[in-house]
Design a protein with these regions (language model features):
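His/Asp/Glu-enriched, well-ordered alpha-helical/loop segment
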Residues: 138-145, 187-274
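Histidine/acidic-residue-rich catalytic or RNA/ligand-binding cores of hydrolases
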Residues: 118-130, 158-163, 180-189, 206-223, ...
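Alpha-helical scaffold segments that flank or form the walls of functional sites
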Residues: 1-46, 66-75
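A structural motif
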Residues: 25, 47, 107, 166-167
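Short, acidic/turn-prone active-site loops that include or flank metal/cofactor-
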Residues: 53-58, 116, 173-177, 202-204
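Metal-coordinating catalytic core of metallo-dependent amide/deamination hydrolases
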Residues: 37-152
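A conserved active-site cap/scaffold subdomain adjacent to cofactor or substrate pockets
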Residues: 156-157, 163-194, 198-200
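Conserved, mostly hydrophobic/aromatic
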Residues: 24, 42, 83, 113, ...
C-alpha cells in the first residue's frame, strides 16, 4: 500500500465499483488512504459512497480528518463523510481524544475496527483497563451514534453500550474466516435489538466483493456458532445486507422502496438456472 500512487488508488476504486455492481451493491462504506483519489473515482462514476477516516498513528491527522469531513460532505449528494479512526491498537490517546472532540463539534457518528481479534481486546485492556467499546464510550465518541466493524470479541458491557447508544455492528464473515479472527456473536446482537449490517472488508482480507456470498456466510456461521439452524431468520439477514447497512451509513433515504425515498435498487433475473424453481 505504501507504494500506491494517487492514480493507482483512483483506478483500483473504479475496479472495485465495477465489482460491487456485479453483485448488486449500490453504495459502499469506505475507510482507506489517499481519500481524495477515492472520492474522485466515486464522483466520476456516480456511485454512492460514504467515507470514513482511517486516522491512526501513521496516517493522517485530526486536521486532515476535519478537512475531509467538510470537503466530502459538501461535494455531492452521493458522497458523505463520517468521522472515524482505524482502530484503538493503532491510534494513540491524544488522537482518540481529538476524534471525540470532532464528534462533539459536528454531532457526527464515529466508526472504527472494533474487537476484531482476541489479542486486540486483550491489548486494549492492558493499556486502558477497558475494552475498545468501553474506551470509546468513556471518551464520549458515541454521543451521536456510529459503531464498529467486526465486533467479534465482545463483553457483556459492550453489548449494553451498543444497545443503549443505538450503534451498529458490521460483520465481515469472509474476512474473519480468512484471517482466523473468530465468528461474530450475531445472534446476541440480534436478540438485543442492535442494528446489524454485513460488509465485505477490503480486498486484502477477502479477495471478493460479493454481497450474496457474505449473506450466505453470515447466516451459516451464526448457525454453527449457536448450533441452531433456526437462530436468525433469513429475512433478518436480508435486512442486514440492505436496510441495516443503509442505517449504518446514515443513508436513511435509501433504506427501503417507498415514496420519497431514493431509488437505490437492483434487479435479479429469476429466469437464471440457479433461481429456479421459484416455489422453493
Amino acid at each position: 500500500e505504501a507504494k500506491l500512487a494517487g492514480d493507482d488508488v483512483y483506478w483500483l476504486n473504479i475496479l472495485g465499483i465495477m465489482e460491487y455492481l456485479t453483485s448488486g451493491i449500490t453504495s459502499n462504506f469506505d475507510m482507506y488512504i489517499q481519500q481524495k483519489n477515492s472520492i474522485a473515482a466515486t464522483v466520476d462514476t456516480g456511485f454512492r459512497t460514504v467515507l470514513t477516516s482511517g486516522l491512526n498513528n501513521f496516517v493522517d491527522s485530526p486536521e486532515i480528518l476535519e478537512e475531509m469531513y467538510n470537503y466530502v460532505n459538501k461535494l455531492s449528494d452521493r458522497t458523505s463523510y463520517l468521522l472515524g479512526f482505524h482502530a484503538e491498537y493503532t491510534t494513540g490517546g491524544p488522537l482518540l481524544e481529538s476524534v471525540a472532540k470532532l464528534a462533539e463539534k459536528y454531532h457526527s457518528p464515529v466508526w472504527t475496527h472494533n474487537a476484531e481479534t482476541k489479542s486486540e481486546v486483550e491489548g486494549c485492556k492492558e493499556r486502558w483497563g477497558l475494552t475498545p467499546t468501553q474506551l470509546m464510550e468513556r471518551l464520549g465518541m458515541f454521543q451521536y451514534g456510529g459503531g464498529g466493524y467486526h465486533c467479534i470479541w465482545m463483553e457483556d458491557r459492550d453489548f449494553e453500550i451498543f444497545r443503549d447508544r443505538k450503534l451498529t455492528a458490521v460483520t465481515n464473515p469472509s474476512s474473519n474466516l480468512k484471517l482466523a479472527s473468530g465468528i461474530c456473536p450475531l445472534k446476541r446482537f440480534y436478540d438485543n435489538g442492535i442494528n446489524l449490517a454485513i460488509g465485505t472488508d477490503g480486498p486484502a482480507s477477502n479477495n471478493c466483493l460479493d454481497m450474496f456470498r457474505e449473506m450466505f456466510l453470515t447466516t451459516g456461521l451464526s448457525k454453527v456458532r449457536e448450533m441452531d439452524a433456526a437462530g436468525i431468520p433469513a429475512d433478518a439477514i436480508l435486512y442486514m445486507a440492505t436496510a441495516g447497512g443503509a442505517h449504518a451509513m446514515q443513508l436513511t433515504d435509501c433504506d427501503r422502496l417507498a415514496a420519497g425515498k431514493k431509488a437505490d435498487l437492483v434487479m435479479i433475473d429469476l429466469h437464471q438456472p440457479n433461481m429456479q424453481p421459484e416455489n422453493n
